Amino acid sequence: MAVAMAIVASLVASQLIGSKDLSWQVAIALFALAVGIPHGALDHFVTVQRTNKKSMFVFIFVYVLVAGAAVLAILKWNVLGFQIVVLMSLVHFGVGDSAFLNELDRLKGISSSRLPTAFVVLAFGSIPVVLPLINSLSTSALAQVNTNLVNWHQGFDESLRAIVLVLFIVAVAALIITKRFRDIIDLLLLTALAVLTPPLIAFAVYFGCWHAMRHTARLTLVLPESLSAYEQGKALKAFWSAVLPGTPALFGAFILAAGLWIYGNVDKSFFWFVLTIVWALTVPHMIITAKLDRKALRI
């Protein structure tokens, strides 16, 4: 629903304000990113026992250390760091969607027409990540974030578009064969978001209103408080029990971004620093959630 609303809002704003005006795009993107940031902070709740304070401290220290190293690496090697982030995000988002759908099948007791994960995982990841970065509006959007990223694809934008198209066709064919028509709608919705909305909004809305929501929904199955509320039929309480513990990460991320922006040695936009932190957090987040993903995918 949020994705559909974002598509409509973008189309309306593009007509009334203008597709080249980035002010409204940055505002929506920052809000969507803010919605998504807390979900990554919940990793330690499902990885380390909170009763073991020493293990928790070590975990948080290593988590922050890895994320901090990633931030510095991206700031130093903008293009290479961005390319690695694109690849990692593609894999992480694709696996995350596939894991969510498998968990949903398990909860509904669906044993037939299983998700053809091998044929859809890259499509679910590449459509929301790659397509927005190679459309006609990406140049001005990336220039607004960081001019070094404008030619991140090194001239292979058409080749990347062709690869994503092939992945999309293969995924749709596999879903038709397995009669998973609801998942085809998901792919079409993601494609519409990537094609019809500006790049900044496409990525941010996907991250905050699609990936983060699905990841949080999966966490309600493993967080004790959420699981208890779910078993009592209190779905909304179960969801919020998985969301609220991660909100300090939201404030921490923006405080860190503001600090880098104000006291940094280089002249970058606030939005660039926010994105850098979000991308950097993907590194430890992806490593930690691998165990949860393997279980969902039965690997």
Language model segments and positions:
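Membrane-interface helix-loop-helix junctions at boundaries between adjacent transmembrane segments
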Residues: 49-57, 61, 68-129
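N-terminal membrane topogenic signal
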Residues: 1-5, 115-116, 240-241
